[in-house]
Amino acid sequence: MKSIYKYLDTRLFLIGLLVLPFLAVVSCQNDDDDAIPVIHYIRVTDPAKADSTFTDVNPGTMIVVVGEHLGGTQKVYINDQEVSFNRNYVTSTSIILTVPNELELTGQNPELKGEIRIETEHGVAAYNMHVLSPAPYITRISATYPIKPGDQMTVIGGNFYEVQAVYLSTEQPAKDGTRPVDVQEITNYEVNNKYSQITLTAPANLLEEGYLVVECYTSSAVTEFKKNGPKPVVTAVSSTMPVVGSTVTITGQNFIEVSRVNINGEFDIPVGDITTSNTFDEISFVLPQAPTQSGHISVTAIGGTVESAEIFYPLENVILNYDGIGSHVWGDCSFVVADGSSAPYVSNGTCLGITGTVSASNYWWKQSYSNAQWVNTSIIPGNIPIDDLKLQFECFVKEVFTGPVFQIAMCENFDAALNGYVPVSSFTGKTETGKWMQCSVSLSSVVADATYQDFLNRNSTHIGVYATNPGSSQATIEVYFDNFRIVRK
């Protein structure tokens, strides 16, 4: 018996020697986390940037909180809001977590504490951390021009959080936000509660022209400033070849006191026929006639004259218009000259109509097979990639329909044809009804050739529009097409 006990004592002694270091480690860890937590700094997770610390951070950023006694972390708060974290990424000296995208920011609510706060059983650690608001932007300046000292101006835009300064300067700030040497600071301003407008008073000795800068904590927003009015800007035109009698819409900026809209240098739109939006970023008018040559629309407002970038009425690019350019060959379709009493109400002479009631699961219903007149290589060089070209046309959809779709094919290449197409406005991104709209599709979605010359080398003039109804119920449609053209993107 004594030998057995002696043997057991020896085994227990050896086991004790093995367990003792482990207990010591656990004891040290417990001692380490049994103290008040401390945060030393915050860094990014990239090990190569481990020495780069910061206090400003964007929402959605993964960060490492470095400190001491963090192993027992129970809760984490950012801007006084509890945030989630994965306990698998918590050690005694660090916590890895992501700043939530949906966090309420101090820019929106200055009463929040701009800090990260960690709570354990033994205390609380806090560290100043500024979660950045979205970058500010300016769309326009609303004012009565010409602006005089003491006049009220409204800067319209968004994300005007934590405004640090508003100033005028003849120079733009540097890319890093550094101010120019000479600035005219404006101290009398007020930000609205949606952070979308800043109302200010024009200072004495007002600059003739330069830049207005809104300096926020996150970054700065800059816009051109002209005492006598900013130059208008055109960003888009609803159609480059609108049907006569249809409405043309131009979007942009600074359409203030529009005094002239000129079409291709040929004729003006009467000022009384021009409608300007309340925000001066859109004008519209009815096109009274078609220009006889391609050109550009120009808009004259209080700040000067600007031309549209895209060619307006690119007559040289038209490949089919049912009035002398190209020709219809065969197909069950109709041709209409609008008379104002029924759809499409207005037209540039003759247009193609695909109308009627189509039965369900009908894969051969209405079609128009035509010969096109391809654009000359003096207008579109043969080496232009097909990916750089688009097929445009005007389309009128009387009412929304469900089921029927169109196929557009060219050069007998039906394998590459555009299938399942429903007309959509290239301007609004949706199917407009009861009016003409410009549609635009990449030419590469209709043909399989690499270059425009490869396309021409097919030696075919075919262009076809085919209507089918793969839907499970019959449908009635009334759709018109005109002015097919190939243009550069």
From Swiss-Prot:
Could you tell me which residues are lipidated, with the kind given as N-palmitoyl cysteine? 28
Its biological function? Answer: Polysaccharide-binding protein present at the surface of the cell. Probably mediates xyloglucan-binding before xyloglucan transport in the periplasm for degradation.
Main site of residence? membrane
**Additional info?**
Gut bacteria supply the human body with energy from dietary polysaccharides through glycosidases that are absent in the human genome. Xyloglucans are a ubiquitous family of highly branched plant cell wall polysaccharides present in the vegetables we consume. Enzymes involved in xyloglucan degradation mediate the conversion of otherwise indigestible plant polysaccharides to short-chain fatty acids.
Cellular localization per UniProt: Cell outer membrane
Q: Which residues form the signal peptide?
A: 1-27
Q: Which InterPro entries match?
A: Ig-like_fold (IPR013783), Ig_E-set (IPR014756), IPT_dom (IPR002909), SGBP_B_XBD (IPR040475)
Membrane-topology descriptor:
Lipid-anchor
Q: Which GO terms describe its molecular function?
A: polysaccharide binding
Is Membrane tagged as a keyword? yes
Recorded protein name is: IPT/TIG domain-containing protein BACOVA_02650
Top-rank taxon, per record: Bacteria
Regions annotated as coiled coil: none
A Gene Ontology BP annotation from the UniProt entry: xyloglucan catabolic process
User: What GO cellular component entries does it have?
Assistant: cell outer membrane
Any keyword Repeat? yes
Pfam families documented for this protein: SGBP_B_XBD, TIG
Q: In which pathway does it act?
A: Glucan metabolism; xyloglucan degradation
UniProt keyword list: Carbohydrate metabolism, Cell outer membrane, Lipoprotein, Membrane, Palmitate, Repeat, Signal
Q: Where is the lipid attached (S-diacylglycerol cysteine)?
A: 28
Q: Which residues form the IPT/TIG domain?
A: 57-103, 136-204, 232-304
